[in-house]
Amino acid sequence: MKGGVGKTTLSTNFCYNIAVREGKKVLLVDMDPQFNATQCFFSGDDYIKYCSEGNDTVVSLFQDEKLKVSTVDGAETATRKEYKDMLPYKYKDNLYIMPGNLNLYKVSMASGGGRDFRLKNYLNVSNKVYQFDYVVIDTPPTPSVWMTSALLASDYYVVPVKPDPLSYTGVDLLRAVIDDKMGDYGHTLKCAGLVMTMVERGTIVYNKALEWVSNDKHWSQYLIKKDILKRTNIPKWQLSNTFINDIEDSDLKLGLSGVVTEIIERIDNYEKVN
């Protein structure tokens, strides 16, 4: 329910880690109209080239039959493809991305007419071809048709929280939104973890946040033991398409690896029970 909590850092590095380190086949879907996750995988020039060649982005999933979209050469009319023809971008072996697009703002925000289920329907079709081990959806921080679509397409959700009062107050609002929205659709989601991000260990702010989560009757059971440390260079690394796995920072990498491992273990345990 709040931006700037390390959501994109967590989602992109989670995908990169399990694809490169674990050899899992992963799809990242960038559902945030600001498409920050996409910019972690593309340079500006490469992204413009990708779009100008008519390749697919999340707009392909949500546009109506005819939609005016902006390109580097001006506005043109696009026709929605069939799901089987919407192809994700292969970043490297095992790692695919359905890029975000600023034009998502131009698609009607109104729900209904099956629009809320388009992402779910697309993933059902796409997974028959690619057989992904995991699909990770990076969502906008506020309630919208895009968040609803992501929730309906998901079995689990992960909550990143920056250790400050505004951020961890927002997790209760997020929980209320998820419960309310999914109740309307009769869809059940499980929380696979609450991850502390941008952490400065030993600070008063961090200790208070950790105490709050540890004592909370609901969220304490979901707290991931490892966390993502604060590094001022992370935005610069992202703009140069560099991931935590490739950085010479053992503490940062160890934290990420622990977060990824625990999230996967939680999901595996849920799957065994069900």
Give the residues covered by each predicted segment.
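P-loop NTP-binding core
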Residues: 1-274
